[in-house]
């Protein structure tokens, strides 16, 4: 079972310093119209040990310097599925530049040319045999 840590606003400096090599990342927003109407509401990170960090950003100022230091760190690979939305939301609200990303949807389209099924559900089923 995964260990889950919840944070309001930002991760701690200790957590930021503990994140090495690669992390999985996903975001949630109040909708898809960013920045016109919707806001970034949740950031989820999982480290290489399966430890999950759930960050609820401060929607008044979106200050998260420790998280930004991780997102901008070129030595840490950020892995996610269909990162276009996540990356743009993080960059807009946190005023940062997310570096060194690996998008599993793009990788699927490049490598799995035998199908047009590139959704996360399809990848999990094919590679992990899970539904």
Question: Where are these predicted regions, by residue range?
Answer:
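Conserved RNase H-like, two-metal-ion catalytic cores of nucleic-acid enzymes
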Residues: 1-122
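A short, charged helix-loop
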Residues: 122-131
């Amino acid at each position: 079972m995964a260990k889950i840590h919840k944070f309001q606003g930002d991760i701690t400096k200790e957590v930021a310093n503990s994140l090495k090599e690669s992390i999985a990342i996903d975001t949630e927003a109040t909708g898809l119209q960013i920045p016109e109407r919707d806001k970034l509401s949740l950031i989820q990170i999982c480290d290489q040990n399966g430890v999950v960090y759930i960050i609820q950003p401060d929607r008044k100022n979106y200050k998260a310097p420790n998280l930004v230091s991780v997102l901008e760190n070129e030595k840490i690979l950020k892995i996610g599925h269909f990162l276009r939305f996540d990356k743009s939301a993080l960059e807009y609200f946190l005023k940062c530049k997310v570096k060194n990303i690996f998008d599993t949807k793009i990788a699927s389209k490049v490598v799995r040319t035998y199908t047009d099924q590139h959704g996360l559900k399809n990848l999990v089923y094919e590679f992990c045999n899970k539904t």
